[in-house]
Amino acid sequence: MVKKVVNTSGKRKTAVARATVQKGSGIVRINSTPVELYEPEIARWKIIEPLQIAGDHLDKVNIDVNVKGGGFMSQASAVRTAIAKGLLEYTGDPSLKIAFLDHDRSLLVSDSRRKEPKKPLGRGARRKRQKSYR
């Protein structure tokens, strides 16, 4: 018997999350920590969104996610994208895809925005020193 294992990834800024979805009993771990214990709480809420939308599909799978890079909210966004993609690929349910897209498109599509590089004569990408013509 061949085990069905699905590997997916999600990205946000410099955070990269890799999710492994396989047959199981509904356990979700992020960096070996159960999702119920993941801190900070606001990031946990963001991660739980695709799990709540999936509903009954979650009871038949275990999801292990490894995430690194970026800040805690970027990591949370990357994790939720990886989880949603993994569940969709594992189940192959078109109604689940519609539910994810209706809720939030970023569940299935990685956010491609990056930090704009700093330029000379200023403290940031756009801010410049004030000019005086007198």
Where do the language-model regions lie?
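Structured, basic alpha/beta domains of bacterial-type, RNA-associated proteins
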Residues: 2-9, 17-22, 26-68, 81-134
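Beta-rich strand-turn-strand
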Residues: 73-80
